[in-house]
Curated annotation (Swiss-Prot):
Protein name per the record: E3 ubiquitin-protein ligase Hakai
Molecular-function annotations in GO: ubiquitin protein ligase activity; ubiquitin-protein transferase activity; zinc ion binding
Compositionally biased region (Polar residues): 304-314, 434-449
EC number: 2.3.2.27
Pathway of action: Protein modification; protein ubiquitination
Alphabetical GO biological process terms: mRNA processing; negative regulation of cell adhesion; positive regulation of cell migration; positive regulation of endocytosis; protein ubiquitination; regulation of cell adhesion
Stated role: E3 ubiquitin-protein ligase that mediates ubiquitination of several tyrosine-phosphorylated Src substrates. Associated component of the WMM complex, a complex that mediates N6-methyladenosine (m6A) methylation of RNAs, a modification that plays a role in the efficiency of mRNA splicing and RNA processing.
Source species: Xenopus laevis
Family according to the record: Belongs to the Hakai family.
Record's keyword annotation contains Nucleotidyltransferase: no
Zn finger region (C2H2-type): 173-199
Catalytic reaction list: S-ubiquitinyl-[E2 ubiquitin-conjugating enzyme]-L-cysteine + [acceptor protein]-L-lysine = [E2 ubiquitin-conjugating enzyme]-L-cysteine + N(6)-ubiquitinyl-[acceptor protein]-L-lysine
PROSITE patterns in UniProt: ZF_RING_1
């Protein structure tokens, strides 16, 4: 009983005691002893041994150790987070930020605040920049350039550092055109100017010379102007003048230019004799010809350009339509220097017919009076006739309607060899019927004497038969633009 009681008591007591003991031992002994055993764990000691000084929050090393490493600790594995102790989580959800993140070439960490070296414009993190200024000399440490996937080499700069600027992330633009440049600028415009000045300069000289050869072809050949508008000397005139004048224009429309046309309306575009005698001969060939061209545009009488004898001249030999003002064999003739309007003194005319109305526009082959003596231009022997027009017998007293030389050629200076008026003859617009040789009707339009080279046969163009139209009244006496001959009134009654 006692034993049982003891057992029961023991069991009860043991059960109760054991329960109390367990309750006491578990929280006191087990819980209290285990923390004491865990405290001397080596982890805090390892951390303390790794960083002897007070650790930075979030990093396991201080600024000096980080600077002294000079990126060598992270040189082979830069930009990888294996050796970095990040104290924040990266959430890659969201939009991509355009602001680039640069890594410091000294410590290899991302740069939040730049330390910008002036004047070389290289950047490091601001802490490394200040540490470099304190410990190192006043030279830029240079930048790191990637040799291969995991290796980098340092590009030396060695520029003296005057000051260090502090810049926030996103405020600088770094040059990445050339590897190792890494210069930073405060604006995109300055960065582009740096790229154009430093890196694109070599390509510019090759592109510049290309547009240069474009300009020379734009200028017209200088020989074109003298061929068309300036009367060259006889020798040169025979060579290059004919092809243009015989091809470009239709047969020159004959203007009914009997004596009224030559006297008054021709005076409107004819300079005074004083101008003829005073101006030197060589410039006159150019200046007066140019004046002739300009007066044609304003005159109501002459509208035919220089290339008048195109088709008609084609039937003639390709001689110069207008010989020059001065022929070598007649150097001293004074009145010949009027290349465009004045009829040469050697021209012989029949007695003037009743004046037909002046034509203000070119006419196709105006009526040519039959039997009239031809206007002799004394410019040269007539070229051989290849297609002679049918002989016609117009009534006498009419000048053959031939294009006056001032319309297409300057009159020749030398007097005709067949005996024309002397050199000091009256001006060409004065007609002396007595001095004009009268030709027979059987001579036709093919036999006027021509003694000067470059002459033009007046009868080369087939002229319609019939007398020229009669004028209703005397030609208008209203002044017309252009210089007037001072003696114009002297000869006016002759034609009225």
């Amino acid at each position: 009983m006692d034993h049982n009681d003891n057992d029961l008591q023991g069991t009860n007591s043991m059960g109760s005691l054991s329960g109390l003991d367990v309750r006491r031992r578990i929280p006191i002994k087990l819980i209290s002893k285990h923390p004491n055993k865990i405290k001397p764990a080596p982890r805090p000691q390892r951390n303390m041994n790794r960083i002897p000084t007070k650790p930075q929050p979030g990093f396991d090393y201080n600024e000096e150790e980080r600077y002294e490493n000079k990126g060598d600790v992270f040189n082979n594995q830069r930009r990888f987070s294996a050796h970095l102790f990040w104290d924040f989580k990266l959430n890659l959800i969201g939009e991509k930020e355009d602001t680039p993140v640069h890594f410091c070439d000294k410590c290899g960490l991302p740069i939040k605040i730049y330390g910008r070296m002036i004047p070389c414009k290289h950047v490091f993190c601001y802490d490394c920049a200040l540490m470099h200024e304190k410990k190192a000399d006043k030279l830029c440490p240079g930048t790191l350039v990637e040799d291969s996937t995991d290796t980098f080499k340092r590009m030396s700069c060695n520029d003296p550092v005057q000051r260090i600027e502090q810049c926030a992330r996103g405020s600088l633009f770094m040059c990445s055109i050339v590897q190792g440049c890494k210069r930073t600028y405060l604006s995109q415009r300055d960065l582009q100017a740096h790229i154009n000045h430093r890196h694109m300069r070599a390509s510019k000289p090759t592109a510049r010379p290309q547009p240069e050869p474009i300009h020379p072809p734009l200028a017209p050949p200088p020989a074109e102007i003298p061929d068309r508008f300036i009367m060259p000397p006889d020798k040169h005139h025979l060579s290059h003048m004919p092809p243009k004048q015989h091809i470009l224009m239709p047969p020159p429309p004959m203007q009914h230019v009997p004596h009224e046309h030559f006297s008054q309306q021709h005076d409107d575009i004819r300079p005074s004799p004083a101008d003829i005698s005073l101006a030197p001969p060589p410039p006159r060939s150019v200046n007066q010809d140019a004046f002739r061209i300009s007066t044609r545009q304003h005159s109501n009488l002459i509208t035919v350009p220089i290339q008048d004898d195109s088709n008609s001249g084609a039937r003639e030999t390709p001689q110069a339509p207008g010989p020059t003002l001065h022929h070598p064999e007649y150097p001293g003739q004074p009145v010949v220097a009027h290349p465009h309007h004045i009829m040469p003194p050697q021209q012989h005319y029949a007695p003037p017919p009743p004046p037909p109305p002046p034509i203000s526009h070119p006419m196709q082959h105006p009526p040519q009076a039959a039997g009239t003596p031809h206007m002799v231009y004394s410019q040269g022997p007539p070229p051989p006739m290849t297609t002679a027009p049918p002989p016609i017998t117009p009534p006498p007293g009419h000048i053959i309607a031939q294009i006056p030389p001032y319309m297409n050629h300057p009159p020749p200076g030398p007097p005709p060899q067949h005996g024309g008026p002397p050199v000091n003859a009256p001006p060409p617009h004065h007609y002396n019927p007595s001095s004009m040789p009268q030709f027979n009707e059987d001579q036709g339009t093919l036999s006027p004497p021509f003694t000067q080279p470059g002459g033009m046969s007046p009868g080369m163009w087939p002229a319609p038969r019939g007398p020229p139209p009669r004028m209703q009244g005397p030609p208008s006496q209203a002044p017309m633009p252009g210089p007037h001959h001072p003696d114009q009134a002297r000869y006016r009654p002759y034609y009225q």
